Amino acid sequence: MEVFMAKNVKTKSKNKNKKIVDNRTNIDIKSQFKKVETGIKNGVFVFTNNLTIDEFSKKINKHSAEIIKYLFLKGINCNLNTLLDERQMGELCLEFGYDFKKEIQINEDNFLDNIKFEDREDLLDKRPPIVTIMGHVDHGKTTLLDTIRKSKVAATEAGNITQSIGAYQVEWKKHLITFFDTPGHEAFSKMRAVGADLTDIVVLVVAADDGLKPQTEEAIDHALFAKAPIIVFINKMDKKDANIEKIYSQLAEKNVLCEEWGGKTMVIKGSALNNQGIDELLEAIIVTAEIMELKANPKRLANGITIEASMDKGEGAVADLLVQSGTLAVNDYILVGEYYGKVKKMVDFNRKEIKTALPSTPVRISGLNGIPKSGDKWIVTNDEKLLKELSEKRQLNTKQRKLSNFGTNLNENSQGIKELNVILKTDNNGSLEAIKGLLSSIEVTGAKLNLVRAAIGSINESDIDLARTSKSLVVIFNTKVSSKVSDYAISMGITIKNYNIIYQIKDEIERLLKGILDPVFVEKEIGSVEIRQLWSHSSIGVIAGGRVLTGEIKRNAFARIKRKDKEIISNAKINSLRHGKDSIASAAAGKECGFTLENFNDFVEGDIVEIYEIVGETHE
C-alpha cells in the first residue's frame, strides 16, 4: 500500500492556478433575494409565516367574525390575537375557496442558509468525500489518522481527547479523501446543531477488546440522526481478547446492522498501530463515496462552511474553512457568517501557503474583520461593497434579535402524532433498563415518546449538543451535572430535569405527553334565560329580552334555543348584552337583560335559551 500526503492543487505550473482563478463565474447574491408579499394571488393565498386571526382576515378579505365562528364550531376558543398555524391557515383557505402556498422570503439575514446554486451538470466534477473519524476515547482514532497520513502525531493519553480541530487530505489510488479530525463527535454534532452538512461519511472506531462504550454509542446517535453513512473500523484486532460477535451484537442493538449479519453497514477489521486493514478501510470509503456520487462545481467563486475560528496574535481573525463548491483563492472578497474581508493569506492542512483551494479542501484564511462561529456558512463574490453592507446588516440584526429558544421539545411527525424527544442518562444499567421499561409502558393517544438517546453516565456537552439538534428534553437519574455543563445547557436553551425516584420520571413524562396534545374542547353549561319580550331594531335585528333563570349569561358565550323541548338552534354566539341602556359583560340569575344572537332573529316569547361556553380541557 502506498499512502502519501496529497498536495492541495496539482502544480504543473503557476499559470494553471491563474487560469482557474480568472475563469471562475461570479455568484450574484442579489439575484437570490426574494421578497414575498402575503396575500391572494390568482386564487392562491401566499404567506411566509404564521398570522393572527386579525392579520389573516385582512389578507384574505374576510371578516374576522367568519374565521372566529368557523374555529369555534371546530371547538377552538380564539380571539383576534390568536396566532394561526400553517395547518389552520390552509384549512381556512380551503373553506373560503382558496388554494394556499408557503414561500420563504430571502433577505440579507437568511440568504446564506437558503441560497440555491443551480450548477449545470456539465460543470460538475467529482469531489473528495469528507470523512469524520469518531469513537470512544483511547480506541485508536488518532492512531488511525496517524497511520493513514503517515505522520507521527503524538498519541493522546487514555482518558483525554484530541484538542485541535482540523482537517487533512490524503491521496490513495488516485482518489483524494478529506478527513475531518475532530475532538470526537462534539464538533460533528455542533455542526449539525446549526444545520451545517459538513460530513459525508462517518468512520466509527471500535476497539476489538473493549466493544461499544458510552462515547461510541453517542457517536452512533449523532451519525444516525444526521443520516450519515457509517463504516465501522474494528481496531486492535491483534489483542488476544478480541470479541467480534459481541461488537456485532452491540451494534445491532444501536440499529447498526453489519453486512455479516445481513445489514448494509461495512465493517473493516484491522490494527491502526500495525498498519493492518488500512487499505480495506480506504477502499470502503472510496466505494461509499462512489455510491453517493459526490460532485461540485469548481468553475465558480466558492462557498462553504466554517470549521473553527479564532484570534491569532500575528494575523488577527483566522478561520478554518471547508470549501464545499467553487474554487477559493487568495484576494477573494468573502462573507463568513456576519463578517467579511479579503483573503489575505491561505494555508492548507500542512500550514503551507497556497493560492487556490478546490471543493472538499480544508484551509485556514486570514483577513476577516471579526471571528465567525463554527458552522457559519460563507460565500465569495466580486462585489466588495455589497459584502460590507451585508456584513453590517447581519451584525446589526443579530444585536437586535432576541435569542431563539432552541430547547423546544415538541415535534410533530407526518401522521400528526405529537412527539416528545428525550435524552436519558442514568447512574447504572439497572436503573437505565428499569426507566426505559416504565417509559415504554406509557400510552397517550395522539402523543409519542421518542428516546433519542438512553445511556449511562453524567450528562456532558455532547448530550446538550444532541438535545439542541433534536429538540430534546434532557432527563437524568441519580447523576450530577457539572456547573460547566449546566451553564452550557442554559446558554443553549436546553432543559435538564433531575430525578432520584424512578416513578417520578414516568409521571412527569406522562404529564408532558398529555400537555403537548391539543386540548379537548367541550361545552360548559353556565346558565339559562327565559325569553319574555321581543324588540326589532333596524340595524341590529331582533333583541330578545328575558330573565336569567339559572347561572349567568355572558357576552360572547354561545346559546342553544329550546322551544317546547325541541332544539331550534345551537352554536349561536351572543353578540351584545344589555341591562337597560347599559352594555354589560354578564347578568346573573334573577336579573333581566336584553341580548342579540349572531345570524339569528327568529325568537318566540317563551323560548328557553341555554347558555354555554366552549372550554379547552387537558387530557387526563
From Swiss-Prot:
Keywords assigned: Cytoplasm, GTP-binding, Initiation factor, Nucleotide-binding, Protein biosynthesis
Location in the cell: Cytoplasm
Region span, G5: 271-273
Stored InterPro entries: EF-G-like_DII, IF2_II, IF2_N, P-loop_NTPase, Small_GTP-bd, T_Tr_GTP-bd_dom, TF_IF2_bacterial-like, TIF_IF2
Region (G1): 135-142
Residue span of region G4: 235-238
Principal place of residence: cytoplasm
Organism encoding this protein: Malacoplasma penetrans (strain HF-2)
Region (G2): 160-164
Keyword GTP-binding: yes
Residue span of region G3: 181-184
Positions of transmembrane segments: none
Protein task: One of the essential components for the initiation of protein synthesis. Protects formylmethionyl-tRNA from spontaneous hydrolysis and promotes its binding to the 30S ribosomal subunits. Also involved in the hydrolysis of GTP during the formation of the 70S ribosomal complex.
SUPFAM superfamilies: Initiation factor IF2/eIF5b, domain 3 (SSF52156), P-loop containing nucleoside triphosphate hydrolases (SSF52540), Translation proteins (SSF50447)
NCBIfam families from the UniProt entry: IF-2 (TIGR00487), small_GTP (TIGR00231)
UniProt xrefs under Pfam families: EF-G_D2, GTP_EFTU, IF-2, IF2_N
GO molecular function terms listed in the Swiss-Prot or TrEMBL record: GTP binding; GTPase activity; translation initiation factor activity
Similarity section: Belongs to the TRAFAC class translation factor GTPase superfamily. Classic translation factor GTPase family. IF-2 subfamily.
Protein name: Translation initiation factor IF-2
Chain positions recorded as GTP binding sites: 135-142, 181-185, 235-238
Domain tr-type G: 126-295
PROSITE patterns (UniProt xref): G_TR_2
GO CC terms, sorted: cytosol
